[in-house]
UniProtKB/Swiss-Prot annotation:
Part of the 50S ribosomal subunit; part of the 5S rRNA/L5/L18/L25 subcomplex. Contacts the 5S and 23S rRNAs. The gene is rplR. This is Large ribosomal subunit protein uL18. HAMAP family: Ribosomal_uL18_B. GO terms for biological process: translation. Belongs to the universal ribosomal protein uL18 family. Keywords: Ribonucleoprotein, Ribosomal protein, RNA-binding, rRNA-binding. InterPro entries: Ribosomal_uL18_bac-type (IPR004389), Ribosomal_uL18_bac/euk (IPR005484). It comes from the Bacteria. One of its GO terms (molecular function) is 5S rRNA binding. One of its GO terms (cellular component) is cytosolic large ribosomal subunit. Gene3D superfamilies: 3.30.420.100.
Length: 120
């Protein structure tokens, strides 16, 4: 019998393949994106030391929007994570889309982070 794998299981396999080749360093940390049905999260991670340097999400107290699951909210999270990263002196990052397609909310977050000063 043919079984169909869930979308999230397929995404996790894609993410594992990408993570095998991609890691963040202290000089160029990894900007990781996680997308749920209601919210979006972004973290800047130093994989060598295993430390999250900066994070932002639609659940933050600094974030005030009615809806956390649209592209406008994702763009605000991108601006917020870029602002927090620049305060810590981080300008160059490696973008990790987390196995998601580079489209919609993930693309909006990435574009807003680029416009706010992050380079990737």
């Amino acid at each position: 019998m043919i079984t169909k794998t869930s979308k999230n299981a397929a995404r996790l396999k894609r993410h594992a393949r990408v993570r095998a080749k991609l890691s963040g360093t202290p000089e160029r940390p990894r900007l990781n994106v996680f997308r749920s049905n209601k919210h979006i999260y972004a973290q800047v991670i130093d994989d060598v030391n295993g430390v999250t340097l900066v994070s932002a999400s639609t659940l933050d107290k600094d974030f005030n929007a009615e809806n956390g699951s649209d592209t406008a909210a994702a763009a605000k999270v991108g601006e917020l994570v870029a602002k927090r990263a620049s305060e810590k002196g981080i300008t160059n990052v490696v973008f990790d889309r987390g196995g998601y397609l580079y489209h919609g909310r993930v693309k909006a977050l990435a574009d807003a982070a680029r416009e706010a000063g992050l380079e990737f």
